[in-house]
């Protein structure tokens, strides 16, 4: 997978267009909305807007050799749920797989229902410490594929890989 990497300080961002989003090529499931990266920026980025899916799968990859050694990083999805969002009673799953292959993937789940109609939120997929032993490609995903519950109203701006401290 190819991605566009934007670096702000030590924060690395992979925008929604560069993530692998199931069904994002179909207008009935996802649309794209240009918006400012942040309030002080003139830079526009495309956010993915969930119209309706029952199979949510948003994932990506990143080469950790781009990062500073011996630093703790977290992988964070930057998302928002619009006022009319629905189908978020079922938790989404988050998974982070490290390059060394020796450790089990970090997995967690989070219910997004309480965030409907609020501001942009950060959803952590996990964290890792960079070292020569685990340099390489990480993969991360946010998904919910078992419930068959239709979901609507999720905005995905980017995934940030940023120093934890």
Curated annotation (Swiss-Prot):
What InterPro entries does UniProt report for this protein, alphabetically? PP2-like, PP2-like/Lectin
PANTHER family tied to this protein: LECTIN-LIKE
Top-level lineage group: Eukaryota
Q: Name one Pfam family in it.
A: PP2
Q: What is this protein called?
A: Uncharacterized protein PHLOEM PROTEIN 2-LIKE A4
Q: Which GO terms describe its molecular function?
A: carbohydrate binding
Q: Which gene encodes it?
A: PP2A4
